[in-house]
């Protein structure tokens, strides 16, 4: 029996309308009744996730910013990882050949240089939103991550530019087909979950995890039981071909799987 369950949010626990379904909420409550520790492992900001947990009265650990922050049930900061100031400066000040929008994160929030209302659709559940700033005036010493949002082919070309400029000084990953992230070296959900399990006196073998994108790769590959969403990025399925694939987030597939796991643990599972 797993002792900790870690969940990605977008494309995994959240439905396509960016809400948590009632079946999902009910299943999370059942896990807590079984004394299974809940952990939300997401690229979203800690401020947003703390608001969501408060609104739902959920007790859960938080891995946010794709591993840049880990918080306890009480909101205590257990782990932090920031981009080196020189890396943040290069990414912010360089003229990149891209049409993608740039987004900067630190403990105070989400910042960008121009309005992009379409992006806010993903935050209707929480009301979290960006702040408009002069990117060149952004404090460089506290940047957790930098994201580029746009067309996937354009971002793939940008990834090459970033790698040529940064080399091994940053970790680049796609958190979605339309979002490329620049993170501190060694920073990912799997590394953050390792920190959390050590804090809790658990091993990664005691954990199950669910995800759909390349920013979930290390987490899914390191736990005792990793599960890939049916709507996952093809690259993730190719990287972890040995992991089982469950259903689509629109059908609350995580809840579907966990209900079976709780009720019929000795029977084989089918996502149908």
From Swiss-Prot:
Which chemical reaction does it catalyze? 4-amino-2-methyl-5-(diphosphooxymethyl)pyrimidine + H2O = 4-amino-2-methyl-5-(phosphooxymethyl)pyrimidine + phosphate + H(+)
Give the enzyme class. hydrolase
Keywords, ordered alphabetically: Hydrolase, Magnesium, Metal-binding
Kindly list the cofactors needed.
Mg(2+)
What Gene3D superfamilies does this protein map onto? 3.30.1240.10, HAD superfamily/HAD-like
Q: Which GO terms describe its molecular function?
A: 4-amino-5-hydroxymethyl-2-methylpyrimidine diphosphatase activity; magnesium ion binding; phosphatase activity
Under PROSITE patterns, the record lists: COF_1 (PS01228), COF_2 (PS01229)
Q: What InterPro entries does the record tag this protein with?
A: Cof, HAD-like_sf, HAD-SF_hydro_IIB, HAD_sf, HMP-PP_phosphatase
Residues that hold Mg(2+) according to the record: 8, 10, 212
Q: What does UniProt list as catalytic?
A: 8
EC number annotated for this UniProt entry: 3.6.1.-
- Coiled-coil regions listed in the entry: none
The family this protein is said to belong to: Belongs to the HAD-like hydrolase superfamily. Cof family.
Q: Which HAMAP family match?
A: HMP_PP_phosphat
Q: What does it do?
A: Catalyzes the hydrolysis of 4-amino-2-methyl-5-hydroxymethylpyrimidine pyrophosphate (HMP-PP) to 4-amino-2-methyl-5-hydroxymethylpyrimidine phosphate (HMP-P).
Which protein is depicted? HMP-PP phosphatase
Q: What is the lineage of its organism?
A: Bacteria, Pseudomonadati, Pseudomonadota, Gammaproteobacteria, Enterobacterales
